[in-house]
């Protein structure tokens, strides 16, 4: 659906709307410092992947905590924390396709998507070993995203929310587990995706 925009001369309201409208829906050559700063200020991001099978389940996972870093103009990394599933890792292992998305829930509306090729690497991989992630016990590895498309859109229909704080429940859950219990949990819960694709954890 197209947008019909009427801008009246010398009307600051319509001129402002025009500038805002024309600034959205862009495709970028890279992740600029300004865009990287905007990404860092978002409290949640979403990860979308899918298997190759036509009847396979598309997966979308919300992510929080201080787990994401912009490494350079075309590369993003985030910590893969222990969870109840292994969909993202199983999918990128099979076909590499991945999209990250952020929404502005505060401030001016905006949606940013970074699509490309993903891979899960070990925490001691030379490409990420010097990245300053917080120490999250139970991290399964790092997901690297090599961007081939970077774009934004308006986000005019996304509601506003106030950020109250991070949840502690996952960190508390991990703190109550021994190393052996975490290994047993991953062996049981993270071995395969819901479609039967192997997870193959790096740790």
Where are these regions (language model features)?
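Binding-site signature for planar aromatic cofactors or substrates
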Residues: 2-203
């Amino acid at each position: 659906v197209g947008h019909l925009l009427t801008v009246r001369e010398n009307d600051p309201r319509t001129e402002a709307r025009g500038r805002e409208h024309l600034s959205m829906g862009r495709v970028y050559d890279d992740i600029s410092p300004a865009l990287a700063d905007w990404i860092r200020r978002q409290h949640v991001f979403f990860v979308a992947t899918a298997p190759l099978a036509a009847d396979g389940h598309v997966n979308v996972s919300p992510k929080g905590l201080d787990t994401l870093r912009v490494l350079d103009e075309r590369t993003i990394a985030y910590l893969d924390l222990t969870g109840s599933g292994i969909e993202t890792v199983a999918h990128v292992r099979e076909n590499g396709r991945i999209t990250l998305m952020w929404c502005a829930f505060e401030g001016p509306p905006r949606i940013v998507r970074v699509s490309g090729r993903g891979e899960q690497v070990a925490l001691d991989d030379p490409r990420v070993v010097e990245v300053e992630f917080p120490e999250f016990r139970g991290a399964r590895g790092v997901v690297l995203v090599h961007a081939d498309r970077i774009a934004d859109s308006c986000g005019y229909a996304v509601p506003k929310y106030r950020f109250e704080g991070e949840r502690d429940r996952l960190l508390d859950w991990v703190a109550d587990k021994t190393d052996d219990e975490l290994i047993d949990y991953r062996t049981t819960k993270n071995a395969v995706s819901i479609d039967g694709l192997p997870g193959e954890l790096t740790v």
